Amino acid sequence: MHTSSHRRFNPLTGEWVLVSPQRADRPWHGQVEKAPPENLPSYDPDCYLCPRNERAGGARNPDYSSTFVFDNDFSSLLPAENPTHAVDHPLLVPVYERGICRVVCFTPRHDLTLPELDQSTIESIICTWIDQTVELSAKDFVQYVQIFENKGALMGCSNPHPHSQIWGTQYLSNEPAKELEHQKAHFKQHGRALLTDYLNEE
């Protein structure tokens, strides 16, 4: 393995990334954030995502006992058509983006994160992700479904109750679009899947 500065090629994106292993020897090892509180309650009456509580948008959660899915009250994307106003400047071109943003509460428990759940509960969450992906993909304007989880305030998570988000978007996001194109090019050139080749190399 290289021990000095070098650029490494990312075959999924076609980009070169600077790698500087020698910087691991410097005395500063990065910002250290405080660990989240260890003794969270199983139910928090002030939590927007706990069962029976009122959400920030005014709706009240049901008394759910497994996963709970709802459209995000403060969605980054909206499903209604709302064409972008034309801008007569080549450097300021907007493109309207439709989408659906949903929240998936893993369980009613405020204090249990995904790795702390039992296998059957995790399987139930995965089945919910699959069902949501199928449902969103069936909408005529949805071209891409992304499932993700933000962990901690530093990553933009506004609520500690364990949950993920699912976005169904009208267009393929930049990173997945690049990855798709490079995987197509690899298959066309070699007749094999890029990720399978990478796994075999590992």
Where are the model-predicted features located?
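HIT superfamily nucleotide-processing domains
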Residues: 1-202
